[in-house]
Design a protein with these regions (language model features):
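Exposed, low-structure sequence patches enriched in small/polar residues
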Residues: 1-319
Length: 319
């Protein structure tokens, strides 16, 4: 499978919609802090994917990308003598590869690939290992960098008590790079529930160059509510989730300690010694299709311009 992608669009740093389009009408309904820090992205990408019957998939890519600061986002580089220089844009050239192993998986390979919601075998464990290599001096690339990611996910069945979908991820940026090339935890500022995203974290609130994250969603399948007279006939199903990330910013990528780096934007800080955590409780199968969750932020509660809690919704068919 060989593909070519040419893209010119505007994005919010720290907000990637992994399972839907960012132009989705529901995703466009924002409930978090107003998003004013943007980037114009111009990207050209070749990608090759090969799949084997044993569940192994190999994907490789090469791309050239230009990021231009927009809105209130500024690229301001601090020199060794304290001089501040504003840059209009940055360019990166990258080659990358990913191995994905999901033994026993059966999936519908649509626009979202094997991560589609139409995956027919959610019980299969999924393991991923990827590496991105930035090359300076090729097609205008300005930075050498190495970025490694590894993840594992599995559905755990608890018999009549429902099941838990779990995911463990870790990543590291090995080189000195400006903050747009560091790890920005994925946030969700929309009214919708988005997998693998933090719903109570502001976009660009934290930055890190190494992290470990854990996500778990427990589907109780009506184990509690089906035992309550008068409510059982509604066939509501309980959902509980937890999202957390722990990481840090090494000295070489901290502009407060190392020169020739971009200053962090206002409202952005390194992820500290305390992990960021949030949890939710909710109901699904409302009118057979609707899910409503209440999310609560558990740490970093004293930060300015944050929301400690909020309601998110999703359209989810349950069988």
């Amino acid at each position: 499978n060989l593909s070519f992608i040419q893209e010119y669009d505007v994005y919010t740093p720290g907000q990637d919609f992994l399972f839907t389009s960012k132009d989705n009408i529901f995703v466009a309904w924002k409930v978090g802090e107003p998003v004013t820090k943007m980037q114009y992205i111009r990207k050209s990408m070749f990608q090759y994917e090969k799949e084997w019957l044993n569940g192994l998939t190999w994907r490789s890519w090469v791309y050239n990308q230009n990021n231009q600061a927009a809105g209130t986002l500024k690229y301001i580089e601090k020199e060794a003598d304290g001089t501040l220089i504003q840059k209009k844009d940055i360019t990166t050239s990258e080659i990358g590869t990913q191995l994905r192993f999901a033994p026993g998986e059966r999936s519908y390979d649509g626009r979202s690939g094997k991560e589609s919601v139409f995956n027919l075998s959610k019980d299969a464990p999924i393991f991923k290992l990827s590496h991105q290599l930035g090359i300076k001096g090729v097609l205008g690339g300005e930075y050498n960098y190495n970025h490694t990611e590894v993840s594992a996910e599995k559905r755990i069945w608890l018999s009549s008590f429902g099941h838990i979908d779990t995911q463990l991820k870790a990543g590291k940026v090995w080189n000195k790079v400006p903050f747009p090339l560091l790890i920005l935890p994925n946030t969700n500022q929309s009214i919708t529930i988005q997998p693998e995203a933090f719903h109570m974290m502001n976009a660009l609130e934290f930055v890190t160059d190494q992290y470990v994250s854990f996500n778990a969603t427990y589907y109780l399948k009506g184990w509690i509510l089906n035992r309550i007279p008068g409510i059982k006939w509604l066939r509501l199903r309980e959902v509980i989730s937890f999202n957390g990330i722990y990481g840090g910013l090494t000295d070489k990528n901290n502009p407060a300690l190392t020169p020739n780096l971009f200053l962090l934007p206002d409202g952005t800080r390194p992820l500290g010694k305390t992990p960021y955590m949030e949890a939710s409780v909710g109901l699904e199968n409302i009118f057979k299709i609707l899910r409503i969750d209440y999310y609560r932020r558990l740490t970093y509660l004293d930060e300015p311009n944050i929301k400690k809690g909020g309601v998110r919704i999703a359209l989810r068919f349950s069988f």
